[in-house]
């Protein structure tokens, strides 16, 4: 819920109502997420309501997921905070007909550069790849990406080895639908 609420967050009392849990359970869950540095609490806006105001819980902006979108002529890399805010985006041109291994290399170099230049104080939870083609759901193996000329390519596994990060992949259109329905 905190992730889906974006930058606006939810108050603890809203989380209690939305999740159907009692206040002490919500306090314990929020406390645990805070100790993991996945959420942050801030003071609520001033209002004229009676009683003690409930803190607002938001997703931490320093915890990010990286995205990779291989295209025919470029690879787009982005950093997205847990609340859904895009922090950085870079498009790196690639040669026509680049194979999967070449795309892995360009992606890994762009990620390394982006992390060093702009995101050194952020914690990466993983990389999500939006592939314009058929992707095997259980392991992200690219079965067929006709626009890229890729057939049976272990792009996800190779990118994980090259970056040392967890990598997941899915069809780009399916991911777009999921993002639209979530945010």
Residue ranges and their predicted role:
Residues 43-45, 61-63, 110-111, 181-182:
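Short, well-ordered turn and helix-capping elements at secondary-structure junctions
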Residues 89-183:
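Glycine-rich phosphate-binding loop and adjoining helix at the ATP-binding site
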Residues 1-50:
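Nucleotide/phosphate-binding catalytic cleft detector across ATP-hydrolyzing
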Residues 37-38, 56, 134:
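Short hinge/loop at the helix->beta-strand junction immediately C-terminal to the helix-turn-helix recognition helix
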Residues 53-89:
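Gly/Thr-rich phosphate-binding beta-strand-loop-beta motif of the actin/hexokinase/Hsp70
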Residues 50-53, 137:
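A short, glycine/Asx- and small/polar-enriched loop/turn
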Residues 7, 82-86, 134-136:
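Short connector loops/turns at beta-strand edges and beta->alpha or beta->beta junctions
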């Amino acid at each position: 819920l905190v992730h889906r609420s974006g930058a606006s967050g939810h108050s603890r009392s809203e989380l209690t109502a939305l999740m159907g849990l009692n206040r002490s359970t919500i306090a314990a869950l929020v406390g645990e997420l805070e100790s993991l540095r996945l959420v942050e609490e801030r003071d609520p806006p001033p209002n004229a309501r009676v009683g003690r105001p409930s803190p607002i819980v938001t997703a931490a902006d320093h915890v990010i997921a990286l995205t990779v979108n291989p295209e025919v002529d470029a690879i787009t890399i982005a950093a997205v905070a847990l609340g859904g805010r895009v922090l950085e985006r870079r498009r790196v041109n690639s040669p026509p007909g680049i194979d999967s291994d070449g795309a892995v290399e360009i992606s890994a170099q762009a990620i390394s550069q982006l992390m060093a230049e702009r995101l050194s104080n952020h914690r990466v939870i993983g990389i999500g790849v939006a592939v314009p083609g058929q992707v095997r759901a259980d392991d992200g193996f690219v079965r067929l990406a006709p626009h890229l000329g890729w057939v049976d390519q272990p792009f996800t596994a190779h990118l994980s080895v090259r970056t040392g990060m967890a990598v997941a992949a899915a069809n780009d259109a399916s991911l777009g639908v999921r993002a639209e329905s979530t945010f």
